[in-house]
Amino acid sequence: MNIVTSNRIFLSQVPDKLASDEPFIFWDTCALLNLVRIPLIERKELTLNMLQSYEFLLNEIEMGHVQSIASEVVLSEFSHHVDNIINQLHNQEQRIKDEVKSQTAYMANAQQANVISQKIEFLDVSNKVIKMVRKIWQKTYILRGQKSFATNADYRTRNYITPSRGKESYKDSYIWVSFISLLNKLQPTEICYFFTANPADFAVDKKTTTLHPDLATEMPA
C-alpha cells in the first residue's frame, strides 16, 4: 500500500501545528492494522460494529473535530505489515465470491442465480477498509522520531518498564514515550485518546481498558 502523508512534524513544532484546545487521537499500530483486518473471517473478535466506530472516527477527523496523530514508528510498523493483510483480504474475498457463485448455480431460477452472481461482485468490504485507512493517514500528523524518544524507550526496554514489563518491547515503549512527550509539549485542555488494540501491554490486563497504573502516573496532571 502506498501511504500518503504530508503532515510530518518535530516535537518542537507541536505547539504551532496542533491545537491544545481541540481533542486528539494518538494511534497505536495495532489499532490501525485492525481496521484493515475487520473483514477477515478468522478474526472473530473484530466485528462490523467496530467498522462503524472507525467510520465515526474518520468522519470526526475529516470534519476537523478531532486531530489525528501517530508516531513515525507506527507509520513504519503499519507499512511493514499492511500489504500482507491486504493479500489475505483479497484471497478471502475471491474464495467467497467463487463459493457464492457455485451455490447460486444450483438454484431453480437461473435468472435469479445470475442476478445474485452479478451482485456479489459489488460486495467488497476489503476495498472499503483500505480506502478508510488511506484517508486516516492522509489526515494524520506524523510525529517524527528523535534521540530523546529512542533513549527513553531503550531505558524502559532494558529495565522492563511498562509497556515493556515482562518482555522486551522497544517499539511499544517508543510509541508510549512519543505520546507522553506530545502531551507534555502541547499541554492539551481537551480530552486525548491513546487508541490501542493491545490492552495486554498498556492496560491493567488484556480484559480491561483501564490504563496500567505505571503509565497513569506519567500522564500530565
Stretch-by-stretch model annotation:
Residues 197:
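Cofactor-binding loop segments of dinucleotide-utilizing enzymes, especially the Rossmann-like FAD-
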